[in-house]
A protein has these predicted regions:
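N-terminal beta-alpha lobe that positions the nucleotide/phosphoryl donor
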Residues: 1-167
């Protein structure tokens, strides 16, 4: 039986064939940015451009939480810190795009509760980022823990939020 050696990056980091490679940051090109704003200025009212820029800034302020959730090796303590930072960062969940809201909720469900698709699909409609911040204040976990709540606890937590939000 032969094995294929793991691919490595130029800095020696191993890449699993079934995982995406890390994103590379692209520097902002001033000419492209100016051209985009010039075209927008010709086709959109100033107020609408300002609204778009403000929404992009708010989306950008949630990037650290998205990044923490995407890294599967992020300990629960760091996720709790990222949730705390998000809560006090001046951005409300409702300020974000619907896609970002749902993405954050689904990622939080997968990291704290379960990765069962049926559960995630239901939970993302009922649980909010604020719910997970509140949850972090109530659970006890070791500093480097990567675990989740048990199945019964996850189900009871979701059920309590569904009942609380029902008319």
């Amino acid at each position: 039986r032969s094995t294929v050696p793991a691919r490595t990056s130029t800095d020696g980091e191993n890449f699993d064939d079934n995982r995406p490679q890390p994103r590379t940051a692209r520097a902002a090109d001033p000419e492209t940015t100016e051209a985009a704003f010039r075209i927008a200025g010709k086709n959109l009212p100033e107020g609408e451009i300002l609204n778009y820029v403000q929404s992009w800034i708010k989306e950008d302020k949630s990037t650290f939480l998205k990044n923490a959730l995407e890294r599967m090796d992020t300990p629960l303590a760091e996720l709790a810190d990222a949730l705390q930072r998000f809560r006090h960062g001046g951005v409300e969940e409702g300020d974000l795009s619907t896609a970002t809201q749902i993405g954050l909720r689904a990622a939080l469900v997968r990291r704290f509760l379960t990765d069962q698709l049926e559960f995630v699909n239901i939970a993302k409609d009922y649980l909010t980022v604020a719910d997970f911040h509140e949850l972090c204040q109530r659970i006890v976990y070791p500093p480097r823990s990567h675990g989740r709540l048990g199945g019964k606890a996850a189900g009871l937590y979701l059920a309590s939020k569904i009942v609380a939000r029902s008319p």
